[in-house]
Amino acid sequence: MTTHNRPARVAEEFRHELSAILARGLKDPRITGFVTVTGSKMSPDLKEATVYVSIHGDERVRKDTFAGLQAAAGFLQREVSRALRLRNTPHLRFVYDESVARGDRIERLLREARTQGQAPAADVEPAPGAAPDDEAEE
């Protein structure tokens, strides 16, 4: 039996189960932002889980929610391990994933540039063989 993919499989199950637990909500009043688990990595020995989260809200909401997640790490570790029936409970470490916030910011900047006439109306190149102004002539 090959076990070289086991950490990746366990990480994906860990991410899925943690997402479900967070969707049900935690009782910590600091967790007010919308939390998305964007990814997870498991150490080869399955003793440490790094979970990447994106938190929607202003800076204060993100900081408070992240602090609440870190405080709830022990509870979340136990719940996920119980659901996955892992022999050892992996140590849970949260990392704030800024990629979603960066993507939202880029989208907003592109939208603003389009409305001010500073960017092309379409980010997509025309299909091969299509005239660039097919729609404009109709």
From Swiss-Prot:
Fetch the PROSITE patterns from UniProt: RBFA
A GO CC annotation given for this chain:
cytosol
> Looking at the record, which segments are called Disordered?
112-138
Note the superkingdom of the native organism: Bacteria
Compartments, as annotated in UniProt: Cytoplasm
Task: Give GO BP annotations, semicolon-separated.
Answer: maturation of SSU-rRNA
The biased composition feature labelled Low complexity covers: 119-131
Subunit structure of this entry?
Monomer. Binds 30S ribosomal subunits, but not 50S ribosomal subunits or 70S ribosomes.
Name of the molecule in the record: Ribosome-binding factor A
Q: Which species does the entry assign this protein to? A: Anaeromyxobacter sp. (strain K)
Q: What is the lineage of its organism?
A: Bacteria, Pseudomonadati, Myxococcota, Myxococcia, Myxococcales
Q: Which gene encodes it?
A: rbfA
